[in-house]
Amino acid sequence: EAERIIRNAVPGITASMKAESAYLQKSYAEKDKYLWEIGFDGAYGSVNAKTGELLSFYLYTENSRKGLSSLSEAKAREKAESFLNKIAPEKFAQSRFYESPDFVIYRTAPGDVTEYRFNYYRQVNGIDFVDNGFSITVNRNSGMIVQYNCNWYDSAEFPAVDGVITEESAFDYIDDAAGFSLMYK
């Protein structure tokens, strides 16, 4: 079933790509979560064993330099967001785009952009949950999504935000309590 889910969700996994391995793994982050990890000839994917949700995939044979070599970053982002809306619409609606300058594009030579990577952080009560959300990579030349990862702690509990003080109030409190001042030694 996990293999079927991955094949149906990931356009780059073709009928000719054989499943070579399958493992049931316990999630390292959530003790009640189990994952099916399927290795294909040229790809990898993982699925939540209880819900059937696609959690990740990577097409490691897709490094094409043929095709839409002019795919813009904006078009690649549209493609990524369309995929996220299809695969995980409720979670995607709780996320916001975050541009990470270090990982946005991949180059094989100066000026040679081969892939665009996009990150989306989960938001809870208007606050970014940095280690939760999505990362997705689009190959510029083929236009294919070559990597997807959903890292989402379903069992996470969040404290209420009622009565939370502002950043400025917190700074003033610490400043008053600690008595910070300039000193010369």
Regions found by a protein language model. Give the residues of each.
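Long, terminal "pre-/pro-" and other extracytoplasmic accessory regions
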Residues: 1-185
